[in-house]
């Protein structure tokens, strides 16, 4: 089982406030554990434009057709002061890792400097913090019915309205998440 470039979809019974009704995009999955970003929990009162202002980044030349009023997401409870930018290729930035043919994660400032310009990647999701699981921990949580898994979908990752991402991710595997009992699988 390789969960890289997959969604973790919180089961209705998962009540942890941070992960309740969350969708996590798995960026890295290997024999040491897993790392991902929550893609449906926007931070209140923080948009991409505000991050750029705090970092004193002024897009040059500014393309007014590109909106910078998009939300910044809480990627998870770890390193909440670090930025993680999920985007579509190119991966020519100084600190980029290709997750799949169509997704890249970058942690360097140079990708932020392209935001709002014609050079920015086509699709971008900015998150602060990340989620992580030690070796075997995520698999155990899946066996305990905390999570559903589904192959990632770029439309859900970048374009689906935030409030719909949990439901739409579950639909990828034929599940209507709103009709699932809270204790599914615990017969």
Curated annotation (Swiss-Prot):
Pfam family, one: DUF179
Domain of life: Bacteria
One GO cellular component term: cytosol
InterPro entries per the UniProt record, alphabetical: AlgH-like
HAMAP family: UPF0301 (MF_00758)
Family: Belongs to the UPF0301 (AlgH) family.
NCBIfam families per record: PRK00228.1-1 (NF001266)
Protein name: UPF0301 protein ESA_00394
Species: Cronobacter sakazakii (strain ATCC BAA-894)
């Amino acid at each position: 089982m390789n969960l890289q470039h997959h969604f973790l979809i919180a089961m209705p019974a998962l009540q942890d406030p941070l992960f309740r009704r969350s969708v996590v995009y798995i960026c890295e999955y290997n024999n040491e554990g897993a790392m991902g970003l929550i893609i449906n929990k926007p931070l209140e009162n923080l948009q991409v434009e505000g991050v750029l202002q705090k970092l004193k980044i002024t897009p040059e030349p500014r393309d007014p057709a590109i909106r910078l009023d998009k939300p910044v997401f809480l990627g998870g409870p770890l390193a909440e002061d670090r930025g993680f930018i999920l985007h579509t290729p190119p991966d020519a930035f100084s600190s980029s890792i290709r997750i799949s043919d169509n997704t890249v994660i970058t942690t360097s400032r140079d990708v932020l400097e392209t935001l709002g310009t014609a050079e920015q990647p086509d699709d971008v999701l900015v998150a602060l913090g990340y989620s992580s699981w030690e070796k075997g921990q995520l698999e155990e949580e899946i066996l305990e019915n905390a999570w559903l898994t589904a192959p990632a979908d770029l439309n859900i990752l970048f374009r689906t309205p935030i409030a719909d991402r949990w439901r739409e991710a579950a639909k990828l595997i034929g599940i209507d998440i709103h009709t699932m009992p809270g204790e599914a699988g615990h017969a």
